[in-house]
Amino acid sequence: MLALIFITTSVWLAASQKTFTPDLVFPEMNRNSSWSVANYGEILCPTSFQSYEPKKHQILTRVLVERPSLNTDTKVEGYTCHKVKYETICDMPWYFSPTISHSISPLRVKESECKDAIAEHQLGTHVSLSFPPEDCSWNSVNTKAYEDIIVKDHPVMLDPYTNNYVDAIFPGGISSPGMGGTIHDDMMWVSKDLAVSPECSGGNKVWGLFIHLGCMGGGSRCWKSAPPHRGPQGQEPHFSLPVSFYNKIGVRFHDGEWMKVSVNLDHPNSVTFQVTDFPPCPPGTTIQTAVVENINPEIQELTVNMMYRLKCQETISKMVSGLPTSVFDLSYLIQVQEGPSIVYKREKGVLYQSVGMYQYIDTVTLNTEENQLGENARGQKVFWTEWSDSPTRPDPQEGSNGFFKYEGQIRVPLGMSLRLEAATELMWGHPVHTVSHPILHVISNHTEQSVTTWNRGVNSTNLIGQATRSISGFYNDLKLYLILALIVVSIVALVVLDVIPFKYILFILCPPLLLCRFIKCSTKEA
């Protein structure tokens, strides 16, 4: 009898116990967490994505990811030179109501101008200019302009394998040592000191899922980079490019990481999975791989990891270039592991960042209660309540990390964690050996509606965009016009009524004119 009770109780407990299947990571944040404006040039993508289910990592197929041991702390100090023009425009119509406009616009900077400005900056003799004084004249539009070069400190990363500089502001994400152009015509970057690349160290090839290794063989320049792609003028810059290592082709990301993927099956017929051609390229160029028939979880997982990394780089490229980005683009910037990391949100077109403690979330109870995201591993309900309470609130509303609320329901980018499911669609829906470039957007199809916003402003690496303000002087001069009108009407009335002879009008008119002159001068000085 006791055994029957024990078995029945065990079965009931097992049936009542919920299975925790996390499909999302979400950050816990303090109520007093501070948000700061994010700098697009400093955003780095997660270096890898780990699967939540350990069974996915059973090595049925041996997978090799080859990466150089890049020291991400190697920085090179330098400056950015940004040339701008300050304009003051005075538009005075015939009725004496001037409008003063101030505008700031970028100008193409020359190498000699940049060097001179940096020399003045280092000596502390550079004088920052502002808007010139207005020059107003009746019934005309006058413009006065000053030009200035703004010098800012801007460190970049050193690639120790090519001795090149890596940063999002460079075309293709990479620049040769010394002075280099940026993706902005009005900005140049100059290094303070030429850095020396450390020597490559020898290493052995190791099989595994994610393997870091150094150079195979000796020598100080073991790794060779392809020339950076600059593209046609005005074209969106790409932040990854093919590079070679002893005739092996991989992908180089804008933060300096190089990756080559290969798969060797556990039978004599080995298969190599390798990205051999990824943009920079014209539209329609394909991604070529050598995989033909073999579909397995490890290949799928690795494929999607690569795709997500490229999507993250594409998102950074959009933001740096001021191109439209969707709310779900932010989801490609965040990590998918537990632990502390950066949290992003957008408000009125400005990207902000803070720090949160990421935890696994099971979204099976998503929207069961208002603002509920799901439950964590402890069985606690997780909510996101930072939504607008205004009656005129927009629909949809943006949350953090690519979340948004639409028609009262929270929508989350579950494709970020359900990579195996997305990979199945990716692998079977399109032939792997020739994957067209638009396939990079397939994963975001799981995120339902996307909201596109033009994003330019404080986050941009462009230090100064277009700014205009107008000051109207009509109301300041209104009292002067009223006084003049009153004087004229009074004089006409006195003459018509023959109260005062006309010859005395000049004696009466002089004091008021002097008074008006005084008022006008006082108004200018104020």
UniProtKB/Swiss-Prot annotation:
One BP term from GO: symbiont entry into host cell
Database matches in SUPFAM superfamilies: Viral glycoprotein ectodomain-like
Keywords: Glycoprotein, Host-virus interaction, Membrane, Signal, Viral attachment to host cell, Virion, Virus entry into host cell
One GO cellular component term: viral envelope
Glycosylation (residues): N32, N445, N459
Plastid keyword on record: no
Keyword Kinase: no
Compartments it resides in: Virion membrane
Signal peptide feature range: 1-17
Regions crossing the membrane: none
Name by which UniProt lists this protein: Spike glycoprotein
